A protein has these predicted regions:
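A conserved structural/catalytic subdomain of Rossmann-like adenosyl-cofactor enzymes
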Residues: 2-225
Length: 225
């Protein structure tokens, strides 16, 4: 299955009926979004689509779902419960976070979830492609266009599970559990600290120069008072 569900829609008139009709099933296991006091058009209907797709998938079924990137780390009850089940059941095979304005009709940052009910991997593969692409004008709007080379890079890295610094990472499901079921690649990238070897003499000279600079700045500050 491939799905690009609407992210937000006013379904307040049918919300309670949906919850009641499926309350005895596992279709909407994480819950149905509440009706807000205002801006009913902002109801997150995509959360129902995700749960519906998971419910309908066959034992060997696969799905790719476009979601708002905020879903990857949201702490709200429904989003959290959905990610938790995906991780606990090992059906989240991977995630690709796309650049902003990749779709002309929405400025919402989007990511793609890849689900696999027959997944045998012990790790999910996460790609952060948000920095790729070139900004172009599209009428009154601005969107991001990926070059063929960038598209091929994303496909190659994701398909072959190639780990690249600050771009892709393979994360054990246990680690995802420890980090609150986050699907954000950036939270799992290795933090690298560069070390520069210098002699004690070089260190002392460096510190003396910094001290002299600070003294000069303080003196200048007093002159301006």
């Amino acid at each position: 299955q491939t799905a690009n569900p609407p992210f937000k829609l006013d379904f307040s008139s049918t919300r309670d009926a949906i919850e009641q009709k499926w309350s005895e099933t596992d279709r909407f296991f994480a819950g149905v979004p509440k009706i807000p006091a205002s801006k009913k058009e902002s109801m997150a209907i995509y959360l129902l689509f995700i749960q519906h797709i998971m419910y309908c998938m066959k034992d060997n079924g696969k799905a790719a779902i476009v979601v708002p990137t905020g879903f990857l780390t949201a702490k709200s009850k429904i989003e959290y419960a959905i990610r938790q089940r995906m991780v606990d059941k090992h059906i989240i095979k991977g995630v690709i976070s796309m650049p902003s304005n990749i779709f002309a009709n929405t400025g919402t940052n989007v990511s793609i979830l890849f689900l696999d009910n027959a997944n045998t991997e012990e790790e999910a593969f996460l790609v952060d492609a948000s920095s790729l692409g070139k900004k172009v004008k599209d009428g009154k709007n601005q969107r991001t266009v990926l070059s063929d080379e960038e598209v091929n890079r994303i496909i190659d890295v994701f398909t072959n599970r190639k780990v690249e610094d600050d771009f892709s990472v393979s994360v054990p499901y246990d680690e995802m559990t420890e980090k609150g079921y986050s699907f954000s690649a950036g939270q799992y990238f290795e933090v690298k600290i560069e070390h520069i070897d210098i002699t004690p003499e070089e260190f002392n000279a460096n510190m003396a120069a910094r001290k002299e600079r600070l003294t000069a700045l303080f003196a200048k500050g007093h002159e301006l008072e």
